[in-house]
Amino acid sequence: MNEYYQSPLSQRYASKEMQALFSNDKKFTTWRRLWIALAESEKELGLDITEEQIEELKAHALDINYDVAKAREKEVRHDVMSHVYAYGVQCPKAKGIIHLGATSCYVGDNTDLIIMHEALELVQKKICLLYTSPSPRD
């Protein structure tokens, strides 16, 4: 359900690879990768963040608890904060450092850029395959 982006157009015209790039799973695991990178950088800069907290974040980077995030979003009406909360439920030791000092744009905009970059790489790969494959007239 969350593995692939779903719309009538994507189901008809997009490859499974492209649908996976724009899926909820990709979006929210990228948010978590960005929060891990943020925590690692802040630790390196001297903030009071432990390796144990970072390891806890890494341990739950891929198992998105969609049900908790969805329930929280109904309360707070904010997608990023609902996922911060949901990640904190899974990572109680690291709860206080998730999204520390960041804005919603940190995860939203950077995730969009990462996904667009990967999508363009996929398009480039497919164009190169077309360009290098023999012509039907040959």
Language-model region placement:
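A helix-coil-helix interface module used to build multimeric assemblies
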Residues: M1-P134
